[in-house]
């Protein structure tokens, strides 16, 4: 939570970092939906100044925080089974980053594509256990608790089980047999979305935040966003609404468009539609346009999928995307699996950084495909290979 004192501290840190950089350069509606506008302990001007400093810092390259170095030789000859839907481009990037990391250490990755089917997930776990995998990864954001029986079977077979992006760093899901859920800090994502809305509107943002409760990370984002708005923007007004993955009988795309459209029509002062994920903003954007508000309502989300990065570059109602390096996440997962094999303490919080992308800072980027090294300015995998595993000099 970015409460008033934390906002001020972070803003001061951001200002110092920016000054140092400059010197270097010189060298569906839910009944529980609520409007947040009270309880602020921060003046409007100080909240805006702090938010602008946070946005400026978060628009730079995320700094890598190296976990403790260790000997990865125990990975040689091991096999990991990855169970999950790999049709989504971002999920494929996680797979390929982890594959690259394990291959560098002599381990092999086998992928079982479930295409999003629950029965296929179960079949994949059964095959991995029967195949005596050295580790199993639930790699598409489904919560491990949904497959608690399979996780327990893996534990009984002596196979460590990992999941991705269903918890919060240092707030692990309670599932018997789950070694670790490796995740972004989604509350921090929400905080950054809020800081951007505050800074962009000079502390007068009005709008709606849309979450999908079936996806735990979207709720974490909403929590971070709401706390910042309530604590640090006395003149901001946001509603918090929910859509189910099925949209209550309609498609998810129709549900998202409907929430955006009805929010604007019910409150003509709406100027921001924030979705937990940028893929959802693609559909919410159609609702904005249906409401005739494409020229005044701004959208933002998380994930930096290629279509939204292209929308940023072209100049559309989608105005900001929070990105978390996918290579970093894939390597952080691979690192923890190898720590498990080596008997090392696992790293619950890999401290994966974020970067804010806008129309201004994407103009020189190739947005036809995601390239983390270009987009973030760093090859995060090289840090692991060199500084953590000692494979490169």
Q: Where in this protein do the model-derived segments appear?
A:
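Bacterial lipoprotein signal-peptidase II cleavage site
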Residues: 25-36
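Hinge/cleft segment of the Venus flytrap/periplasmic-binding protein
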Residues: 37-78, 232, 325, 329-393
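Extracytoplasmic "Venus flytrap"
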Residues: 39-97, 101, 110-122, 127, ...
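Periplasmic-binding protein-like
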Residues: 132-141, 160-165, 208-209, 267-277, ...
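Hydrophobic alpha-helical segments within soluble ligand-binding/sensing domains
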Residues: 121, 180-207, 220, 253-257, ...
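Flexible loop/hinge segments that line or gate small-molecule binding clefts
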Residues: 44, 144-145, 150-188, 206, ...
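Hydrophobic alpha-helical
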Residues: 141-156, 225, 245-311
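An alpha-beta-alpha
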Residues: 80, 84, 98, 189-242, ...
């Amino acid at each position: 939570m970015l409460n008033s004192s934390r906002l001020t501290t972070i803003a001061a840190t951001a200002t110092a970092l920016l000054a140092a950089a400059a010197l270097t350069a010189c060298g569906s509606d839910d009944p529980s939906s609520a409007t947040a506008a009270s309880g602020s302990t921060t003046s409007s001007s100080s909240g805006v100044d702090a938010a602008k400093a946070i946005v400026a810092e978060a628009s730079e390259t995320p700094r890598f925080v190296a976990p403790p170095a260790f000997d990865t030789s125990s990975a040689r000859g091991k096999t990991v089974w990855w169970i999950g839907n790999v049709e989504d481009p971002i999920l494929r990037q996680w797979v390929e980053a982890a594959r690259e990391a394990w291959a560098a250490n002599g381990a092999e990755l086998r992928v079982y594509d479930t295409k999003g089917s629950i029965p296929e997930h179960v079949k994949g776990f059964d095959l991995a256990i029967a195949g005596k995998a050295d580790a199993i990864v639930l790699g598409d954001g489904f919560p491990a608790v949904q497959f608690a029986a399979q996780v327990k079977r893996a534990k009984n077979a002596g196979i460590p089980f990992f999941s991705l992006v269903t918890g919060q760093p240092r707030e692990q899901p309670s599932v018997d047999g789950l070694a670790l859920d490796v995740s972004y800090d989604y509350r921090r994502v929400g905080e950054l979305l809020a800081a951007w809305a505050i800074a962009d509107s000079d502390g007068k943002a009005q709008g709606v935040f849309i979450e999908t409760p079936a996806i735990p990370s979207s709720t974490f984002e909403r929590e971070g966003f709401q706390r910042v708005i309530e604590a640090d923007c006395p003149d901001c007004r946001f509603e918090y609404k929910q859509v189910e993955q099925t949209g209550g009988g309609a498609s998810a795309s129709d549900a998202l468009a409907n929430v955006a459209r009805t929010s604007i029509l019910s409150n003509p002062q709406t100027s921001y539609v924030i979705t937990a994920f940028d893929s959802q903003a693609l559909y919410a954007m159609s609702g904005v346009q249906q409401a005739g508000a494409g020229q005044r309502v701004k959208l933002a989300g998380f994930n930096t999928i290629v279509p939204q990065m292209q929308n940023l570059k072209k100049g559309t109602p989608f105005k900001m995307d929070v990105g978390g390096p996918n290579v970093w996440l894939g390597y952080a997962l691979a690192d923890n699996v190898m720590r498990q094999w080596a008997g090392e303490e696992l790293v619950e919080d890999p401290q994966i950084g974020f970067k804010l992308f806008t129309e201004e800072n994407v103009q020189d980027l190739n947005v036809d495909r995601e390239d983390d090294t270009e987009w973030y300015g760093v090859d995060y995998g090289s840090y692991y290979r060199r500084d953590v595993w000692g494979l490169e000099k």
